[in-house]
Amino acid sequence: MQNRKTVAVFQLESPGMKDLIKRLQPTKFEEIVALLALFRPGPLDSGMHDEFVNRKNGKVPVTYPHKLLEPVLSETYGVILYQEQVMESARVLAGYSLGQADILRRAMGKKQVEEMDKQRTIFVNGCKDNNIKEDLANKIFNLIETFAGYGFNKSHSAAYALLSLQTAYLKTYYPEYFMAAVLSSAQGNTDKISSIIKECKDMGINVLSPNILTSGTNFFVNPKKQIEYGLTSLKGVAESFIYHLSDEREKNTFNNLLDFSKKVNVKLGGKKSLESLSKAGAFDSICDSRSIALACIPDMLKEGDKKASDALFAGDLFSNVEEDFNPYDQYKDVNPLNFSQKLKYEKEALGFYISGHPVEAIKDDIKDLRSHKISDLDANTSSATIVGLVNSTRQIKDSKNKPITFVNFDDESGSMDGIILSDLYEEKYGIIQEDTILKFYGSVEVDDYRSRETNSTMYRMRVKNINAVESDLVDSKKDLLTVSYTHLTLPTKA
């Protein structure tokens, strides 16, 4: 946890939380409880988190509003953090009963001004009866009033912290099983699945590509401690079809596409499901290439129609042909997909790339176009030319109401952010599109925010020029970068 490897850890995975963890360096459960109470708008806006961290780390002395409050506030280094501490402070200083203290708690939580004024009088009088001077009593109540804007229930924070600790424990000691469960819980959210798979890679966990022979409905860990892909996470695949497929596979394995067509009701999935499985590579284990799998889909569906319409069907789907005849053999000469097409199809079916990166497809052609890979950047790099795939863009306005564009791009080695000022953006906006490979040139500097987020040195670029990569490649290589997919010309069935 102190190393901020908290992706998928309950409540602890946001960049801001990671930054607070780095500063606080929690060493015990109570500090995790405090961490969760501090990371909320009220404490963050008031600067309470800074005070807490500085006291914990010995940069600021730990003091208490009154010596009677040391047992109440020692756990939080003299900072009033929880509603329960306010209740106990009122009891210790002003003689409140538990019932009266709860009235004070509710008045704070609901910000009841009249009730708080009434409580001030009760509190100050109680403190005076306890030999505490009126001025000090009012100062302490002022602290309590300030706390009313951001007070949190300790029991809630403790419950969250317990879940945080449990998930961190599971991630540490049962990483494969924990990450498989996290992936299964993220089904339907391709961005989340993509980020978790990247985290698995960083952890040394191998997430396998979809496989019709081994993948389950959900993600799971195989005997080799690899994570098998959950087929219900594929885009465009009918969930009922995946469950049917899984049931059929328990009875018999699939030897090839013909065998698959004979044993599975392909009509239940339809064309869209079969295309998604093919593009994701799920048929790779029973078919020579993904292009062949895609070419076979119309015939697979035709056989499904025959099977569904034959009310007297009771046996081999191809019982009227020779046993060694495979009607899909006619597609064996279909050209395989090139690397770029393969990756594009993966993104269609999965929502991300799993077997490589588009920049890899042109790495030989761009070796003279770029000065660095992203992973090559270091403290001595003042400027660089990077070829990267645009992942996302966002804009803010400067003081003159002109756009400043932030672009995130990556290559086969890593990712980084670029800052594009308005003049350059106006000139190049037409090519700055997601999923486009561009050549970025600019000055390089440390990205403090992302460095804190990742606990490693990250860089960003102040972009000075942008070009479309295809304009720098020979025409014969442009097909590798085309946005649309190449259509297959397939032989007709005899």
Regions found by a protein language model. Give the residues of each.
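A short, hydrophobic C-terminal helix/tail in secreted or cell-surface proteins
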Residues: 489-494
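Noncatalytic, beta-rich nucleic-acid-contacting surfaces in large DNA/RNA-processing enzymes
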Residues: 1-488
